């Protein structure tokens, strides 16, 4: 992995260029990773993604918690001359990272043991040792992967739990560092420690004590429990910890923070020096029937962060979900149609939502890179913060609790959600 900084400023963070493997494409940072579930971009086939979302090479974020059942098949695939993990899941031409936890779903707490990390999968809880983890990484052969770590911490975690997470991570990583040479993939060193600056420093110190070339970048874990919890983080508590950590890291290695952080939080983290994020926020919005409508192109109009597809007020609204959006959903369909698809529980509903949300979110990152290059990130941040309104916009995502009963529909589809 090669990472080169093109520009850096105190106010706008840094603009970089990342080459994950020799001969591969270069990616501009800040970079958006494409979140997957079970090896697939949620609701989308490869053809739909590449024809209606993006034709450019992407970095796919694979998670062991949703793909652990593929280990045996991947062992045979790669031993037989398979072309790699992305080809196996039907997304050739894209690079990939293997991570432990699904950022889209809440990770249960507990189940920690001295030498074992709990991995919560679709089949239940699996026990993951350092040895077993490296065997699975060798089977998957990702382009780069996350080091094994105990990230079971959040803002409410006690000091004892935080210290255990750091100590256990050091023990896991001691084995990983010793045996990483058996895997032809780049390692990301995990930085854990909750919201405790001393614990974070200890975790960073352990990583930086390793010989040169032991890892290619950093991944920050342990700030939240994934899922919607990342959309409600208190940035006044988060940002000082991130700033404390970044000051202790060398500049020539990329930094990743997985999770469904809000657009505003992402802008503030970029200003702190974080380089990579994932698209789980767009997925969480789609899952809860919300179309992203926040604006990042400055104008004089007040904007809302979301369009609630479940809202009865749009059932006769025949305007696009977002005006001036060039995605398939907004060019071909209306708000009323999306509401109809929701009411009838049609699969096309989430497909159209994720097409729009990914298109919008990827355009947002294009705007971010443009703003960083011009040293105008603070201006963009303030616009995203208020959306031309008088107060700060709430970008947190609430779980959709509306349920449509088929029995209540009768012979038509006019039943209200309950």
UniProtKB/Swiss-Prot annotation:
Cofactor dependency: Zn(2+)
One annotated GO biological process: tRNA-guanine transglycosylation
Localization in the cell: Cytoplasm
Keywords, ordered alphabetically: Cytoplasm, Metal-binding, tRNA processing, Zinc
Pfam family, one: TGT
Cofactor: record remark: Binds 1 zinc ion per subunit.
GO cellular component: cytoplasm
Major site of localization recorded for this protein: cytoplasm
GO molecular function per UniProt: metal ion binding; tRNA-guanosine(34) queuine transglycosylase activity
Entry binding sites for Zn(2+): 325, 327, 330, 356
SUBUNIT field: Heterodimer of a catalytic subunit and an accessory subunit.
Its job: Non-catalytic subunit of the queuine tRNA-ribosyltransferase (TGT) that catalyzes the base-exchange of a guanine (G) residue with queuine (Q) at position 34 (anticodon wobble position) in tRNAs with GU(N) anticodons (tRNA-Asp, -Asn, -His and -Tyr), resulting in the hypermodified nucleoside queuosine (7-(((4,5-cis-dihydroxy-2-cyclopenten-1-yl)amino)methyl)-7-deazaguanosine).
PANTHER family given in the database record: QUEUINE TRNA-RIBOSYLTRANSFERASE ACCESSORY SUBUNIT 2
Family: Belongs to the queuine tRNA-ribosyltransferase family. QTRT2 subfamily.
Name of the molecule in the record: Queuine tRNA-ribosyltransferase accessory subunit 2
């Amino acid at each position: 992995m090669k990472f080169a900084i093109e520009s850096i400023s105190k106010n706008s963070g840094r603009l970089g260029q990342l080459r994950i493997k020799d001969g591969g494409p270069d990616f501009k940072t800040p970079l958006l990773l494409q979140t997957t579930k079970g090896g697939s971009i949620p609701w989308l086939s490869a053809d739909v993604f590449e024809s209606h979302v993006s034709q450019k090479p992407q970095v796919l974020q694979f998670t062991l918690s949703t793909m652990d059942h593929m280990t045996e098949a991947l062992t045979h695939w790669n031993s037989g001359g398979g072309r790699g993990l992305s080809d196996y899941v039907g997304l050739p031409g894209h690079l990939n990272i293997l991570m432990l936890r699904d950022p889209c779903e809440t990770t249960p707490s507990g189940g920690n043991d001295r030498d074992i990390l709990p991995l919560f999968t679709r089949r239940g809880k699996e026990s993951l040792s350092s040895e077993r983890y490296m065997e699975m990484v060798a089977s998957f052969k990702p382009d780069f992967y996350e080091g094994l770590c105990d990230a079971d911490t959040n803002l409410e975690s006690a000091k004892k739990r935080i210290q255990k997470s750091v100590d256990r991570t050091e023990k896991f990583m001691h084995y990983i560092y010793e045996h990483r040479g058996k895997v032809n993939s780049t390692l990301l060193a995990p930085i854990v420690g909750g919201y405790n600056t001393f614990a974070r420093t200890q975790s960073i110190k352990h990583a930086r004590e390793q010989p040169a070339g032991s890892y290619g970048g950093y991944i920050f874990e342990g700030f939240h429990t994934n899922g919607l919890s990342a959309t409600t983080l208190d940035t006044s508590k988060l940002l000082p910890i991130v700033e404390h950590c970044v000051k202790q890291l060398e500049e020539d290695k990329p930094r990743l923070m997985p999770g469904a952080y809000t657009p505003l939080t992402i802008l503030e983290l970029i200003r702190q020096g974080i380089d990579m994020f994932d698209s789980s926020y767009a997925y969480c919005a789609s899952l809860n029937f919300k179309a992203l409508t926040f604006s990042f192109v400055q104008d004089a109009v007040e904007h809302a962060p979301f369009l609630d597809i479940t809202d009865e007020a749009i059932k006769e609204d025949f305007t696009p979900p977002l005006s001036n959006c060039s995605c398939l959903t907004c060019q071909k369909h209306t708000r009323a149609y999306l509401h109809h698809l929701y009411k009838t529980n049609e699969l096309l509903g989430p497909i159209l939502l994720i097409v729009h949300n990914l298109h919008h979110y990827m355009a947002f990152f294009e705007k971010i890179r443009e703003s960083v290059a011009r040293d105008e990130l603070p201006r963009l941040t303030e616009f995203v913060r208020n959306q031309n309104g008088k107060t700060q916009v709430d970008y947190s995502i609430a779980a959709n609790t509306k349920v449509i009963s088929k029995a209540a529909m009768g012979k038509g589809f006019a039943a209200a959600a309950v």
